[in-house]
């Protein structure tokens, strides 16, 4: 008799583990999509360790696990919780038990104080079940409420494999990082069909909410992956930089030498302040080999943000990119920096600012886009950060650009300069024109060039980096080829830095 019960249990479990009908599996395979349990096998070190509510809706037809797997496993030896939509079950849509399962795995992650990963592939809420799914105290809104409450306490990561529609689009929005699979992933509040019906706009799914659009234009996506396998490996790598929660320190890895280059750093940085160069060239020479994990590479590329290691110590890098738009800060790049700085500060990852910046962009277009507000957001995030902050002036740091890149007034733990550095309100050319425009206009044409050249040299002397070192505005002038060792020593020294908190609830952020 007992064997009959065991047989029933086994048969039910096998049906549930298979997910939806074969035709939906076939459709996913044609799109290059993996089955939800295949995704989890790749994500975890050794497959699922624990799975709750496996039998949710097992008495209903066609709703195995109610379309979502909630599980506990390990990544890099670290315990993590996972919510994973099964798109073979009603397109991964949410029913009442789906929502309850997601809420419960969030509550478990909170109790275990461990990272929570969302594998999203869902058509949204089931309209036919909206009373049980949508408005209640433990309805879908509770998922987003929980995400906000967990933010900064545990890492929250989104792997977006398919759609994340309507209100469900806020799951990725509230995560620390969103990895999207090109060609399949999408997120939008209203579908193209709805947009055409309501506002008369005809638009493709990719234009409305595709992975490439969100990773390059809206900034809602952080990393664009070519395949699901690549996306999963990226998330495993990302987690290696982070502690399990905000109460722990970021993990120290074994020290590795930097990548070998024939050309030393001193020969890579142009002495001409206006000559473009790729800041990646500097970064790769000061970090441990192959440790740069760039975030939002396609969005606002005039600023680089990413995680790296120096002598095994995780560090968050915020660097101007002179190769793109001269490294000028725009509203999008300021927004990009603010989010990244906040992320690193939440999980005790020191910040390294590499400044080569002519300032913030000017003009009516950026003013109307709110560059002052977004710039304030970046400066606010940088000022609020209590982790070790190292500022390096690579070449120019002009105007408010100096402030945004953790200049001396913002209490970085050190402000270092390379011999190529300049700090000023503006560059020599602009300064001479601003101060002497009337005088230049009055001079005979044959005398203007010599006058401008003379005043430019005077200005350069005024902003000489050794003068700033003499005045103790900067802490040290470092040979470029010694920068890595200098940063490693300072990171080690600053790791005992005391965290200070002010007696207020929170600032009024310029968001």
UniProtKB/Swiss-Prot annotation:
Residue ranges crossing the lipid bilayer per the database entry: none
Keywords tagged on the record: ATP-binding, Ligase, Nucleotide-binding
Chain segments annotated as coiled-coil in the UniProt record: none
Single biological process term from Gene Ontology: L-leucine catabolic process
PROSITE patterns in UniProt: COA_CT_CTER, COA_CT_NTER
GO molecular-function terms, A-Z: ATP binding; ligase activity
Domain CoA carboxyltransferase N-terminal residues, every copy: 2-254
GO cellular component entries: methylcrotonoyl-CoA carboxylase complex
Chain intervals for the UniProt region annotation (Carboxyltransferase): 2-506
Annotated disulfide bonds: none
Gene3D superfamilies assigned: 2-enoyl-CoA Hydratase, Chain A, domain 1
Pfam family, one: Carboxyl_trans
CoA carboxyltransferase C-terminal domain location: 260-506
SUPFAM superfamilies xref list: ClpP/crotonase
Matching InterPro entries: AcCoA_carboxyl_beta, ClpP/crotonase-like_dom_sf, COA_CT_C, COA_CT_N, MCCB/AccD1-like
E.C. number: 6.4.1.-
Family per record: Belongs to the AccD/PCCB family.
Name by which UniProt lists this protein: Uncharacterized carboxylase YngE
Organism of provenance: Bacillus subtilis (strain 168)
